[in-house]
Curated annotation (Swiss-Prot):
The keyword Cytoplasm applies. It comes from Chelativorans sp. (strain BNC1). The gene is frr. The lineage of its organism: Bacteria, Pseudomonadati, Pseudomonadota, Alphaproteobacteria, Hyphomicrobiales. One of its GO terms (molecular function) is ribosomal large subunit binding. It is found in: Cytoplasm. This is Ribosome-recycling factor. GO terms for biological process: cytoplasmic translational termination. Belongs to the RRF family. Keywords: Cytoplasm, Protein biosynthesis. PANTHER family: MITOCHONDRIAL RIBOSOME RECYCLING FACTOR PSEUDO 1, RIBOSOME RECYCLING FACTOR.
Length: 186
């Protein structure tokens, strides 16, 4: 193929937008416990802000319970404080160096808030995909202007970039719909 776009790089960047969205929505709380729920929480430990999973083992022993086994006994208070201050509605129970976090039932208002947040995450992912498309299209226009590719080849590659964008946005929308059903399920 003549010069134009590196479609492997474009594909990698589109996949990155989807992966980032998956990571974002994984941290949204549904009715079930998940170790990912604590991903956004950082603990002040050893003079730095660290994710909970770097100072403790996070597990899910029961469907509505998260267990956090802190490795360093002196950090139990800091982990407890970080979880309480994260405003996720968690109330840890300290048992030695382990924190047990029962997940309360989600009320309808909180479920709707979580759906709104999921929609915001999806919009950020769509915008990221559109930025990738814009970069690709600008590269094509420059290549065509510089005479590296023909007008026909630019049109073909442009259509391919648009198709990749549409597929990425469709994948994001599908993931959003699945997460929405999961959140609203009582």
């Amino acid at each position: 193929m003549p010069d134009g776009i590196d479609f492997k790089d474009l594909h990698r960047r589109f996949d990155g937008a989807i992966a980032a969205f998956k990571h974002d929505i994984a941290s949204l709380r549904t009715g079930r416990a998940s170790a990912n729920l604590l991903d956004p929480i950082h603990v002040d430990a050893y003079g730095a802000s660290m994710p909970v999973n770097q100072v403790a083992t996070v597990s899910v022993p029961e469907p509505r319970m998260i267990s956090v086994s802190v490795w360093d006994q002196s950090l139990v208070g800091a982990v407890d404080r970080a979880i309480r201050e994260a405003n996720l509605g968690f109330n840890p129970i300290v048992e030695g160096s382990t924190l047990r976090i029962p997940l309360p039932e989600l009320n309808e208002e909180r479920r709707k808030e979580l759906v709104k947040i999921a929609h915001q995450y999806a919009e950020h992912a769509r915008v990221a995909a559109r930025h990738v498309r814009r970069d690709g299209m600008e590269h094509l226009k420059k290549a065509e202007k510089d005479g590296e590719i023909s007008q026909d080849e630019a049109r073909v590659q442009s259509d391919r970039v648009q198709k990749m964008t549409d597929e990425t946005i469709a994948a994001i929308d599908k993931l959003l719909a699945e997460k929405e059903v999961e959140i609203l399920q009582v």
